[in-house]
Design a protein with these regions (language model features):
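Conserved MFS/SLC helix-loop-helix module at the cytosolic interface between two early adjacent transmembrane helices
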Residues: 55-91
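Helix-loop-helix hairpin linking two adjacent transmembrane segments in secondary transporters
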Residues: 135-181
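Juxtamembrane intracellular "pre-TM" segments in multi-pass secondary transporters
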Residues: 184-213
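Extracytoplasmic gate region of multi-pass secondary transporters
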Residues: 24-25, 209-255
Length: 406
């Protein structure tokens, strides 16, 4: 089967698997009002997804070095469907929402990186970096659409239908992968080709892969903090300062910034290939840190200003997403690719778990929703990104084959 067809199959499946991914963040203001949630409780509902993802992804992704990633994907995407449909039909408060978000995290742990592993097993060499970027793009487009899709369906039929739609689409992803993607069992590694299932020591000795993975950890902290809270932040800014509610509704802005982020992610990888991956990532991190330190305070000035900065911030956050993941995949030894991706994903979504929770906790500690509290909450992300910058400077990861500035 051709490389193009493999990429198309996997990316199409990921679009359907991801279309409900941010339905809960999109409808978070509804849940906060309906269930009288504190900022910390809302953060836990969002963060539960990343908590279970982080706990299960080391095993699920490491297994892709031993069994066909397709088999893992199929079981996991069914869990994704169960989580969405269960949340839609059975959730009535914090604890039930928390449980179904935990299930959703396990589903995505077996869907995202195993899907990428299935793709990368068929696509080798310099084209692999582009395949990774297209995979990230398809996930990003669908994730972006999930904000507006969920909010629109919820406005027509109620929030439960807004959540359930993602579960139905996850079942379509199952059918696409089950019937269109060829099976491909990993080749035997031999006595010295593969470490134990959860022996990540060889991966941690790979300085380049580790640097990109640490950068991804803090990148995902930043990205998920924005995705989890952007609708709530803009809802506050709109209520405080007023604005154009028709064209610039909070859910619409969330979709626009996510779509712009997809473009930035794919384009960013191409720029990284031309000017040097490490150099590009450092420049992007510095820029996003600067925006993070001011964006929250704009909520009390102008809704249009806050919305515009959210779009700019989203572009900067996503700009190095594919570059970091492609850097990890391209730096991995072939027999350790699954384990390397497991470390990458575990570190990334550990940050992804803490980011939304930290935002909610800081909002509570700063006295609740106010321009000052939002300013401090976003500024903490800028401070955290300094650690990602430190990893890139100290570990000095190498560029990849096909990158022009080696």
């Amino acid at each position: 089967m051709s490389t193009v067809r493999i990429i198309a199959i996997v990316c199409t499946a990921q679009v359907f698997a991801q279309i409900g991914a941010f339905a809960v963040p999109a409808l978070l203001p509804t849940f906060i009002d309906r269930w009288d949630l504190s900022g910390t409780e809302a953060g836990w509902i969002i963060g539960a997804f990343y908590l279970s993802y982080t706990a299960t992804v080391p095993v699920l992704v490491s297994l892709t070095d031993r069994i066909d990633p397709k088999r893992i994907y199929l079981g996991a995407v069914l869990l994704t469907a169960v989580a969405a449909l269960g949340y839609a039909t059975l959730t009535d408060g914090f604890w039930s929402a928390f449980v179904f978000r935990l299930i959703a995290g396990v589903g995505w742990a077996g869907t995202y990186m195993p899907g990428l592993k299935a793709l990368s097993d068929f696509v080798e060499g310099p084209q692999q970096s582009r395949g990774v970027a297209f995979h990230a793009g398809s996930v990003g487009v669908s994730g972006a659409a999930s904000f507006i899709v969920a909010s629109t369906i919820a406005s027509w039929f109620g929030w439960r239908w807004g959540i359930a739609f993602g579960g139905v689409c996850a079942l379509l992803a199952f059918l696409i992968m089950a019937f269109l993607l060829p099976s491909r069992e990993p080749k035997p590694a031999g006595d010295a080709g593969q470490a134990g299932l959860l022996d990540f020591r060889p991966v941690l000795r790979n300085r380049s892969a580790l640097a990109y993975s640490l950068g991804y950890c803090f990148h995902t902290w930043e990205m998920n903090a924005l995705r989890a809270w952007v609708v709530t932040f803009l809802t506050f800014a709109l209520a405080t300062s007023g604005g154009w509610t028709t064209l610039l509704a909070p859910a619409a802005i969330a979709t626009v910034l996510s779509l712009a982020g997809v473009w930035a992610s794919v384009s960013g990888n191409e720029v990284a290939r031309r000017i040097g991956r490490r150099r590009f990532i450092i420049c992007v991190m510095l820029s996003s840190m600067a925006v993070a330190c001011v964006i929250g305070f704009t909520s009390g000035i102008s809704y249009e200003l806050a919305a515009s900065l959210c779009v700019v911030y989203g572009i900067l956050i996503w700009a190095d997403s594919s570059s970091l993941t492609a850097g990890t995949v391209g730096s991995a030894l072939p027999r350790q690719r699954g384990a390397t991706m497991a470390v990458h994903s575990t570190l990334g979504y550990a940050g992804g778990f803490v980011g939304p929770l930290a935002m909610g906790a800081i909002l509570d500690l700063a006295g609740g929703e106010s321009a000052f509290a939002w300013g401090i909450a976003f500024a903490h992300v800028g401070a955290i990104m300094a650690l990602g910058l430190l990893a890139m400077v100290v570990l000095r990861p190498k560029d990849l084959a096909g990158d022009r500035d080696n």
